[in-house]
Amino acid sequence: MRWLIPRLGTFAQAHPNITLHLHSAGGPLDLATAGVDVAIRRNDFFWGHTLAAEPLADEWIGPVGSPASFDTPHPKQLHTRTRPQAWQDWQRATRKSPIDANTTTPPFEHFYLSLQAAGAGLGAAIGSVYMVSDELDAGRLIAPSGFVRDGSAYVALAREPFAANPARETLLHWLRSALAESASKWISRETQADTRDAIP
């Protein structure tokens, strides 16, 4: 939602005949009961064998914070309960040294709260390039170490193949294009090539 909502106007202008109704949810998927046509999720859980799945984009993560947060060489590390291994995933991908426990803080309940705290100058959080691209554009956040793949990806899920529904397929192609555009501003081709080999 953090990434999608600011871009809904662009989608509506390009596709005025398609109306999107958004639902924010997590946990087990039951698209039929929820009345949902398409779910956007990370592929870090098992969704069963009955759903059609289409890849959207690899996940790219990196430490982000306000410019002032990085005035110190070791800003406090912000954690979240919904992505408890985020710092470890980044360290694995970059082969950085282990976390110094003295620079950590109690975890936030949700991922987006840790990003909000990072923007408020409370420390550095591991951010998804998609979730923070607008803040990076505006200069509210910086990412001194750049971004690396964490081994996960975003997928679009539906009850039937996307090609069976023109509106659903249109949304799929738009999501892929918009995600790629967001990432391309902050991830160079050289970085993509280097980090593809770094993820086991």
PLM feature segments, named:
Residues G9-F11, A86-A101:
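Ligand-binding cleft/hinge of the Venus flytrap
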Residues M1-F46, T191-P200:
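Central regulatory/effector-binding core of bacterial HTH transcription factors
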Residues D37-A39, Q77, A125:
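Short, well-ordered beta-strand core segments
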Residues Y130-A138, F147-P200:
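C-terminal effector-binding regulatory domain of bacterial HTH transcription factors
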Residues R41-A93, A156-R159:
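Hydrophobic/proline-rich hinge and linker segments of small-molecule sensing/allosteric domains
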Residues H15-H21, R95-T105:
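A local structural motif
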Residues I99-P144, R149:
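Hydrophobic hinge/microswitch elements
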Residues W3, W47-G48, P84-A93, F108, ...:
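Tryptophan-centric aromatic hotspots in well-structured domains and transmembrane helices
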